Amino acid sequence: MTYRVIVTPAAESDLKTAYRYIRSEAPRAARDWIRRARQSAKSLARHPERCPLAPESASFDLPIRELFVGSGNRGTYRFLFVVFDEEKSVYILHVRHGSMLPLTSGE
């Protein structure tokens, strides 16, 4: 079963911010990172439930899952998303660096 993947405006902004930061340190790595990030987002179209629940999921009404992207000295980013089985959709809510505090209900 295939899901439609929707990147919310907040997540798109998060991606751009991360890209600009990485680009300021390593332009080539930034291009590779954004390509991997977009491929990872697209991968959620197949079996999004393979990803674990995010630690902050218990604080929200909907289960929030996380997909880890990246590693090494650039760090790992978490794609935080919800799955709506009824409409076969995945909404990527935010993209956060692994060192950031957990998502709060105000974000």
Residue ranges, per PLM feature:
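Basic, Lys/Arg-enriched alpha-helical interface segments
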Residues: 1-66, 71, 107
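Enriched for short, Lys/Arg-rich terminal
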Residues: 69-107
